[in-house]
Curated annotation (Swiss-Prot):
Full protein name: Uncharacterized protein DR_0269
Bias kind Acidic residues: ranges: 64-75
Low complexity compositional bias, start-end: 14-31
Biased composition (Basic and acidic residues): 141-227, 235-269, 277-295, 308-322
Segments of skewed composition (Polar residues): 1-13, 32-50
Segments for region (Disordered): 1-94, 125-322
Naturally occurring in which organism (per UniProt): Deinococcus radiodurans (strain ATCC 13939 / DSM 20539 / JCM 16871 / CCUG 27074 / LMG 4051 / NBRC 15346 / NCIMB 9279 / VKM B-1422 / R1)
Amino acid sequence: MTNADEQNMGQQEGTDTATTAQDTNTQTVGTQSENTQNTQQASDAQTEQTPAELRDVLPQLTGEVDEDDVLDAQEEQAAGQSARKVDEDGEEYEEEFIDADDLMGLLGEMKEMLEAQSKEIRGLRREMRELRESQGGGFRGGDRGGDRGGFRPREDRGGFGGDRDRGGFRPREDRGERSFGGDRGGDRGGFRPREDRGGFGGDRDRGGFRPREDRGERSFGGDRGGDRGGQGGFRPREDRGGFGDRDRGGFRPREDRGERNFGGDRGGDRGGQGGFRPREDRNFGDREFRPRTDDAQGNQEGGFRPRARADRGWANRRTDEE
């Protein structure tokens, strides 16, 4: 092969390569034009579907293209980290943040609330102290000497221990036992048992509760019957007066109010006027029945007189026509 042939072959290959490159460029341009046409068609279709009110607003909302590489990198890093974290129990929670100004305002409100509560507590303490001082008494070793105001323990309320003369609460052992009086000598004050309330045993001269056996027996007077003639104390039925041969008043049984002797216990010396009088003794004279025809039926006392009637007149006389 000669040099001329080689040159011809080289030119032919170069021509083929150029033709191929030209065809490739032509295809690329055609593809780009097709993509542009498709994009325009899609945009036109989207524009047609967009309402007329938004078509004028969308161009105004379109901003400048963000081409800051630093901001893009930070956004990608933030997007890679999730805002939700997992605690020890495996539950997800979202972190919440508060502004520093809001936090300071919240702390200020809490401070004001605590100050108001402290003032209220101080006022209550002052009122309680004044109340204790007004009631009297005191706690030993207090700020005012222990003689007034303050809390008083049980031993200091009065009467506890047997050596105090103040009133107040006294336990059962100190109110008064068989010694009759507790811490006051045994003769007054304190709780007194039944045997000490008075009149029990027949040898005491005080009043109070006396059992049935001590209120008064046949001796007529209980603990006062021996030296006072049986007047005091409970008196049984036989001793209330008028029973038997006694001249005092009071309750008298039926047998003693007045019998046929006309006067009861006072009939013997008063002519039968006192006491209960039976029917036969209410009028003097004879009790014979007298008919209505008797002329003296209205004049003589002791006779039978019918009940007065208004139609006959108060003279209560019958006429011959009746």
